[in-house]
Design a protein with these regions (language model features):
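Conserved active-site tyrosine of GNAT-family acetyltransferases
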Residues: 93-94, 99
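Conserved GNAT acetyl-CoA-binding A-motif
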Residues: 67-83
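Conserved acetyl-CoA binding element of GNAT-fold acetyltransferases
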Residues: 36-48, 75-77
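Conserved beta-hairpin
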Residues: 4-27
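Conserved acetyl-CoA-binding loop-helix of GNAT-fold acetyltransferases
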Residues: 46, 52-65
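Hydrophobic residues embedded in beta-strands of well-ordered beta-sheets
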Residues: 12-14, 39, 106
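A conserved beta-strand-loop-helix scaffold within acyl/acetyltransferase catalytic domains
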Residues: 19-37, 44
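Short glycine/proline-centered loop/turn elements that form peptide/ligand docking sites
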Residues: 83-93, 105-112
Length: 112
């Protein structure tokens, strides 16, 4: 059984799932930046043994739904934090959700 924890404040949206209330299986977190209605995607992490099982997609869909409801634009930089995650695979993943490259970062505008 997986437990969901969700935190929403004026400056943060975070969602995580853990198995039986223990160590998180996956985490997604975005935080507000100086510009109105813009947030920065701080983290999308899925533990290795849970990868390729739809967790990253689930988190993205949930985070993006909240952003669309609030009219939030998201900025992110692609940084594979481990050697076993390919940059191109991450880029393709984010593009699937509507992120577009602008300079060195990616932007996703809300769907209204």
């Amino acid at each position: 059984m997986f437990n969901k924890v969700e935190i929403q404040t004026d400056s943060l949206i975070a969602i995580s799932y853990s198995e039986n209330g223990s160590t998180p299986v996956c985490v997604a977190e975005i935080g507000k930046i100086e510009e109105p209605n813009r947030y920065y995607f701080h983290r999308l992490f899925v533990r290795k043994k849970y990868r390729n099982k739809g967790w990253a997609t689930k988190l993205m869909e949930e985070i993006l739904e909240k952003c669309d409801e609030k009219g939030i634009e998201i900025l992110l930089e692609i940084n594979p934090y481990t050697d076993d995650i390919d940059y191109q695979r991450l880029e393709d993943f984010y593009k699937r959700f509507g992120f577009e490259k602008v300079d060195y970062y990616y932007v996703r505008k809300p769907k209204n």
